[in-house]
Amino acid sequence: MSMLKPLKPRVLVLMASYNGLQYIDTQIKSIADQVDCEITLLISVDKSEDNTFYYLEDLKKYYQFIKLLDYGAKYGSAANNFYRLIIEANLQHYDFIAFSDQDDVWEQDKLIRHIKLMQEHGVDGVSSNVLAFWADGKKKIINKSQPQRELDYLFESAGPGCSFLMTPWLMNKVREQLTDKNSLAKDIVLHDWLTYAICRAHGHRWMIDSIPSVQYRQHENNVMGANAGWKAKWIRFKRLKHGWYRREVVKIVHICNGIAPNGEIDRLGNLLATKNLFSKLKLLAYVTKARRSLLDRCLLALSIALGIF
């Protein structure tokens, strides 16, 4: 009697691309080299100044697991491009969904390791630390795996989206928000933060793995990625000072409170709606619940006290 081989898990990888010719080959090869998975790679190419889309059309002849969405529209940001993918992707017949950038290198066991973690721990999302690397040979582990806090999902992502693996259930919940005309989801600038927040708002669990799963390329077009170097830190400080971060938190709070009304989140939303001494003092009480990193909690407290946040 013949023994049937167990089916490999089916993973749909969503890749957003823009002017990606320089590094996209390496990224796709690292996805093709994933072990013990059956992969479909769905790519949305934003209107580009190079020939990324036409190059990928030719590459499909070699990598038959590649599928391309229609080309020609301008989405203007990685988040909008990912939102298009989430809305248009056919999620049927897939066991897991992953996000991919166009310029990184995945560790060969990235997907299967995270699949096993999801199955062992009963979570709907897994992300991980990443190993940032530069053209000059510099490398640095970006640590995002500090213990999760009660409300960290209102203030930050679970790490870089390129490390995310999710269930179809979660992707459908994100899609519901993106297609709901009353939701602010499409206004969120970071798709990974939105995804993590929606998962946690539904009361579902997420795991952040300490083992890096992605070599996270740093170059002039994504200097913000690892938040490494004074230029990136200065840009983030300016965003904080000009109110960008607070506005994103306000939108995330609104979305999450709409998913599952919560008295504490509602009170936080009311505090964020005003800027006075009383609201500052009250906001400080949320700091210990807000960010995973001790340094980030200290910086958030300082920014609240100084009126920058």
Task: Write out the residue ranges for each language-model feature.
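A conserved acidic beta->alpha catalytic loop
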Residues: V45-Y55, Y75
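Catalytic donor-sugar/metal-binding loop of nucleotide-sugar-dependent glycosyltransferases
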Residues: A197-Q215
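Short beta-strand-to-loop acidic/aromatic patch adjacent to the donor-nucleotide binding site
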Residues: Y94-D103
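Short beta-strand/loop segment that forms part of the nucleotide-sugar
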Residues: E38-K47, L69-Y71
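Short, well-formed alpha-helical segments that are part of the catalytic scaffolds
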Residues: G20-D33
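Conserved donor NDP-sugar-binding/catalytic core segment of glycosyltransferases
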Residues: D109-K140
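Acidic donor-binding loop at a coil-to-helix junction in glycosyltransferase catalytic cores
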Residues: L184-A197
